[in-house]
Amino acid sequence: GKCGDINAGCSSDCDCCGSSVTCDCAIRKKF
């Protein structure tokens, strides 16, 4: 993944974009 992808190990609403979080997650209201 890239920013905006939803990965199985992450909450679908979590914000990983522009942070130090190692997973890539989508923010539904932005993506």
Curated annotation (Swiss-Prot):
Disulfide bonds join C3-C17, C10-C23. Expressed by the venom gland. GO terms for molecular function: sodium channel regulator activity; toxin activity. Keywords: Disulfide bond, Ion channel impairing toxin, Ionotropic glutamate receptor inhibitor, Knottin, Neurotoxin, Postsynaptic neurotoxin, Secreted, Toxin, Voltage-gated sodium channel impairing toxin. It comes from the Eukaryota. Its main location: secreted. It is found in: Secreted. One of its GO terms (cellular component) is extracellular region. The keyword Secreted applies. Insecticidal neurotoxin that reversibly inhibits the N-methyl-D-aspartate (NMDA)-subtype of ionotropic glutamate receptor (GRIN) and inhibits inactivation of insect sodium channels (Nav). In vivo, is highly toxic to insects. Belongs to the neurotoxin 03 (Tx2) family. 05 subfamily. The presence of a 'disulfide through disulfide knot' structurally defines this protein as a knottin. This is U13-ctenitoxin-Co1a. It comes from Ctenus ornatus. The lineage of its organism: Eukaryota, Metazoa, Ecdysozoa, Arthropoda, Chelicerata.
